[in-house]
């Protein structure tokens, strides 16, 4: 396995980000770390969250010799990113809610942000709105339950559409034309969200922008040369290496199947003392 790209999230939401990165770098090796023992992150004290994430990610970077870390979690990006960058010598990429492109796209200038309560209330989020959407009416919707519904869908294949409609009723009532998906879990249920909200609402997430940033940083660090070499090798021998790591005592059969279908050949539990 060559030096992998390490994608990190509290749960399965980061798979949506990983999928976007793979479109740009299809022959790279990947590690996916999901800290599902502590899901959802939005309910943890900040210092507890920081200590646990730094320990997990730094240990796995050392183990895998990862060349870049992608924090595919909005909560962790706003809380943990500075500590990770202080403890790692490799690039660390975070998630930024797609407020700017949403404001640019909106014709009615009525946009919304659907995220966890933690992301909705953070000062950083309000700074983004002030900086990039001051000409828009912006509605904020915080909902942790949608995170668990996305996890449940991956685990069982089932989605309670009646409950989803109830949760999204305030979004429908707001009469928006663009809704930012401010949690990486939400693209995993994008079809269901679109079904409830209707075709008149455009859903935007940050996956493509993150992938573009990863390519830029690898180029700046001269690591894109290594990626081209790996690409040539992969074209000769086949599929890239994919490893998944989780922290819960066990994961569901449905989630295991999903990871295998995504191309992961190794699915392993790791532990942390934090």
UniProtKB/Swiss-Prot annotation:
Pathway: Cell wall biogenesis; peptidoglycan biosynthesis. This is Glutamate racemase. The gene is murI. The keyword Isomerase applies. PROSITE patterns: ASP_GLU_RACEMASE_1 (PS00923), ASP_GLU_RACEMASE_2 (PS00924). It comes from Shewanella baltica (strain OS185). One of its GO terms (biological process) is peptidoglycan biosynthetic process. Substrate binds at residues 9-10, 41-42, 74-75, 184-185. It holds the Pfam family Asp_Glu_race.
């Amino acid at each position: 396995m060559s030096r992998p790209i390490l994608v990190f999230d509290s749960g399965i939401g980061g798979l949506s980000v990983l999928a976007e990165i793979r479109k740009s770098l299809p022959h790279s090796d990947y590690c996916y770390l999901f800290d599902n023992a502590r899901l959802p992150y939005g309910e943890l004290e900040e210092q507890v969250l920081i200590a646990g994430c730094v320990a997990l990610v730094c240990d796995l970077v050392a183990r895998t010799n990862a060349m870049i870390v992608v924090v595919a979690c909005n909560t962790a990006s706003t809380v943990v990113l500075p500590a990770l960058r202080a403890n790692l010598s490799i690039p660390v990429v975070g998630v930024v809610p797609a407020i700017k492109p949403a404001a640019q796209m909106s014709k009615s200038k009525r946009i919304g942000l659907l995220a966890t309560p933690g992301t909705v209330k953070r000062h950083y989020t309000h700074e983004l709105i002030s900086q990039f959407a001051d000409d828009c009416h912006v509605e904020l919707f915080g909902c942790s339950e949608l995170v668990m519904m996305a996890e449940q869908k991956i685990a069982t294949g089932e989605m309670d559409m009646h409950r989803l409609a109830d949760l999204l009723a305030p979004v429908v009532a707001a009469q928006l034309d663009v809704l930012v998906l401010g949690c990486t879990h939400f693209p995993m249920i994008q079809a269901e969200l679109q079904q409830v909200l209707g075709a008149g609402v455009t859903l935007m997430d940050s996956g493509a922008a993150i992938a573009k940033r990863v390519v830029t940083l690898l180029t700046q660090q001269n690591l894109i040369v290594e990626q081209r070499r790996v690409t040539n090798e992969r074209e000769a021998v086949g599929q890239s290496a994919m490893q998944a790591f989780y922290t819960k005592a066990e994961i569901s059969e449905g989630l295991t199947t999903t990871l295998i279908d995504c191309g992961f050949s190794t699915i392993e539990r790791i532990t942390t003392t934090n």
